């Protein structure tokens, strides 16, 4: 196995050890973390609802969202290995205004997203526990965030890196099994079922929300760059290994989005039941309909899939937003390096703020989550352009990647303008 020295120094001035080229299990980390974070919000809720409401029709939008966002997520990995810095540091170099925009969005998203996924995880855990336990969703949410907090504060990145790989293996295995079982015994369509069409302006908000977090909000690329930086310092991975990790994580996330769409199609599409749109009510309905279709024995299987989705997303959101906000704070204060106390503070902020949202604003959580998804899509062209321009300034992109990136910006920008025009009443 050959070795080489890292060309770019660490952003914090650390001296990195000798790199080892080649394939091993240890190279996987940031890509798997991103996939774990993505699956909870966009996949379990939005993808499954898309299948339940419109069958296979919106599969093309899921594919297009993944295809056209790919280069801008990939640039996070490229930028870290090219410069030794996070994307957030790159935003700060371009303009403090970009840093402030990202910081404000991240502060809001941290508590809304963490609160939403924690509440869903708590509700699903309640489905799995015997009725005799008698714990409320709030109590279960406190238990979940306490586990996440101690896990992240005590173990930091290394422990998170190791555990999420096993979470992803369990999640993928259980999801594939659940979909295969549902495909073998799909819901029988009612005789008078009339398929609804999503291709109208009235459905545009749903499609934008679906694509906003598909596979994740584009500002999550900056969080991925924080994980990539931590992985690079911990294991001194090469650029090629980092890209392999990213590509595997992104591909797994994209494929699972279609599997969750299939779950909605096989279990709910054409059943004649009105599909719930609120996240908590929808998960309850999905589990009950899956059980009614497949059999009572399958309740724990689909509940386990749902819980692993949300628990994995909860812990990765808390860590990711904690790291991103700590990096923003470091750059705003002009400090040389990020420290564990700052990460611990902002991780606690995400978890504690999310818990406060659950406690006092649980009734508005669905609206907040939809707002977060839509705002993520509207801001996607901005962060896409930033990521593209940062990487382009450091290395010459191939003609194919350059054209691909421009096509992605046109797609994201065009859809955003269409949605804003519809919202303003200019069209429709």
Task: Describe every region a protein language model picked out.
Residues 99-131, 141, 310-328, 364-367:
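Hydrophobic transmembrane alpha-helices that form the core helical bundles
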């Amino acid at each position: 196995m050959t070795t080489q020295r890292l060309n770019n120094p660490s952003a914090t001035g650390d001296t990195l050890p000798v790199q080892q080229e080649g394939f091993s299990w240890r190279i996987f980390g940031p890509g798997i973390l991103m996939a774990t974070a993505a699956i909870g919000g966009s996949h379990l809720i939005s993808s499954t609802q898309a299948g339940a409401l419109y069958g296979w029709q919106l599969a093309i939008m899921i594919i297009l969202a993944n295809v056209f966002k790919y280069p801008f997520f990939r640039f996070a990995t490229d930028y870290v290995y090219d410069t030794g810095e996070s994307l957030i540091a790159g935003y700060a170099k371009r303009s403090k205004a970009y840093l402030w925009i990202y910081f404000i969005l991240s502060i809001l998203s941290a508590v809304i997203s963490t609160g939403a996924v924690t509440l869903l995880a708590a509700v699903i855990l309640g489905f799995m526990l015997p009725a005799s336990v008698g714990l409320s969703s709030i109590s279960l949410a406190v238990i979940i965030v306490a586990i996440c907090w101690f896990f992240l504060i005590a173990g930091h990145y290394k422990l998170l890196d190791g555990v999420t790989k096993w979470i992803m293996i369990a999640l993928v295995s259980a999801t594939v099994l659940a979909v295969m079982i549902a495909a073998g015994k799909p819901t029988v369509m009612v005789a008078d079922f009339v398929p609804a069409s999503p291709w109208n302006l009235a459905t545009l908000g749903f499609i934008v929300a679906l694509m906003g977090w598909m596979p994740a909000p584009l500002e999550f690329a900056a969080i991925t760059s924080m994980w990539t930086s931590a992985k690079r310092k911990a294991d001194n991975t090469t650029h090629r290994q980092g890209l392999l990790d990213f590509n595997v994580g992104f591909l797994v996330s994209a494929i699972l989005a279609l599997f969750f769409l299939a779950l909605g199609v096989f279990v709910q599409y054409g059943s004649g039941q009105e599909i719930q749109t609120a996240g908590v009510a929808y998960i309850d309905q999905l589990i009950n309909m899956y059980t009614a279709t497949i059999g009572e024995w399958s309740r724990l299987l689909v509940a386990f899939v749902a819980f692993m989705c949300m628990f994995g997303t909860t812990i990765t959101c808390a860590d990711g937003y904690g790291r991103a906000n700590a990096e923003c704070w470091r750059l705003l204060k002009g400090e040389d390096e990020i420290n564990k106390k700052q990460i611990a503070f902002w991780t606690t902020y995400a978890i504690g703020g999310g818990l406060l949202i659950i406690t006092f604003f649980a009734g508005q959580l669905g609206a907040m989550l939809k707002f977060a998804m839509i705002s993520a899509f509207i801001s996607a062209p901005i962060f896409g352009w930033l990521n593209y321009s940062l990487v382009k300034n450091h290395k010459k992109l191939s003609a194919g990647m350059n054209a691909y990136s421009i096509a992605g910006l046109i797609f994201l920008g065009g859809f955003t303008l269409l949605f804003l025009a519809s919202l303003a009443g200019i069209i429709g």
